[in-house]
Amino acid sequence: MQKLLLAVLFFSLLAVATARPKYHKQGRRKGDACRLNCIFDNVVCEIPCKLLFRSRSKYIDCVLPCRRDRVDCYIHCNHFDATPKTEAEPGSLDKGEGTKGEKGKEGKKEKGEYAIGNAESGNGSSGGSNKTHDDDDDDRDDVHENDDENED
């Protein structure tokens, strides 16, 4: 029992020493960073319970306050998502930003738009094989039909 308590103490000190990761400084949105902090805090809270209690009922009793804290933390994180955005975030498609490629300088397409245009039309300018995924499925279906006829 003493070894177990020392292990719990050691892991608790280790968790405190490593501190919470700084998700907000990694370029994450505030809401996502808040949720990741909630998960980290929940894991750190549950570790001693996992080490101390082997029976399910005692473990659940031990973890119950941790789970309540996690739910409260998530509710607090919804506050960050509910705040109105004054500026569009980079990479988001707000109010017609998706059509920028069509309005490029001198009628040139942007890098990503060319690939999307080829994928939608199915016509490539390389002059290579024009075999599509549907052709492969048709060939495979023909083989299966022949196999069914041979089994009779």
UniProtKB/Swiss-Prot annotation:
Prismatic layer of shell (at protein level). Expressed primarily in the mantle with highest level in the mantle edge and lower level in the mantle pallium. Keywords: Secreted, Signal. It comes from Margaritifera margaritifera. GO terms for cellular component: extracellular region. Residues 1-19 form the signal peptide. It comes from the Eukaryota. Residues 82-113 have a biased composition (Basic and acidic residues). It is found in: Secreted. Residues 135-152 have a biased composition (Acidic residues). Residues 82-152 are annotated as: Disordered. This is Aspartate-rich protein.
